Amino acid sequence: MKVTRHEKILELIERKDIETQEELAEELRKSGIEITQATVSRDIKELKLIKVLGEQGKYKYAAIVKNENDLSDKLANIFSHSVVSVENINNFVVVKTLSGSGNAAAEAIDSLNFKEIAGTIAGDNTIFIMARTSEQAFEIVKKMKRVIRERGV
């Protein structure tokens, strides 16, 4: 049942711009799959779905592509389109994102594999990054700003 449900979720988000868990649950019900909001939430986590900016300017669920080059490019785009500000304080970097984008942006940061990053912690709209030194925190900020500039944001 779970595998079938996951396949249906992936099919639905590929065909339709689904913005909320409630919309996804409703579409699944229309397809004959009875589901609770809690199960939808778990499925989203298990499938590692992310929210991306759709063509209509609204955020929608999307699956992470398996191709490593496509994945890196998509994550860099997610990062550059969701970050509001980046600043360093001592050996920490604080990244502010659009509301609800913290986890996706943190995943993108982790995928950039900056050697200066010791670890990241993400919230709804804020990411804390720990660098090993204050100099490395400054370098992380420079690199992040470069990624944002290169993406034309």
Curated annotation (Swiss-Prot):
GO molecular function term, any single one: DNA-binding transcription factor activity
Pathway entry: Amino-acid biosynthesis; L-arginine biosynthesis [regulation]
Matches recorded under InterPro entries: Arg_repress, Arg_repress_C, Arg_repress_C_sf, Arg_repress_DNA-bd, WH-like_DNA-bd_sf, WH_DNA-bd_sf
Single GO BP term: protein complex oligomerization
Family matches, as PANTHER family: ARGININE REPRESSOR (PTHR34471:SF1)
HAMAP family named among the record's database cross-references: Arg_repressor (MF_00173)
Protein name from the UniProt record: Arginine repressor
The UniProt record lists the keyword Oxidoreductase: no
Family listed: Belongs to the ArgR family.
Gene3D superfamilies noted in UniProt: 3.30.1360.40, Winged helix-like DNA-binding domain superfamily/Winged helix DNA-binding domain
Reported function: Regulates arginine biosynthesis genes.
Species this protein is from: Clostridium tetani (strain Massachusetts / E88)
Tree of life domain: Bacteria
Keywords for this protein: Amino-acid biosynthesis, Arginine biosynthesis, Cytoplasm, DNA-binding, Repressor, Transcription, Transcription regulation
Location of this chain's protein in the cell: Cytoplasm
GO CC, any one term: cytoplasm
Main location: cytoplasm
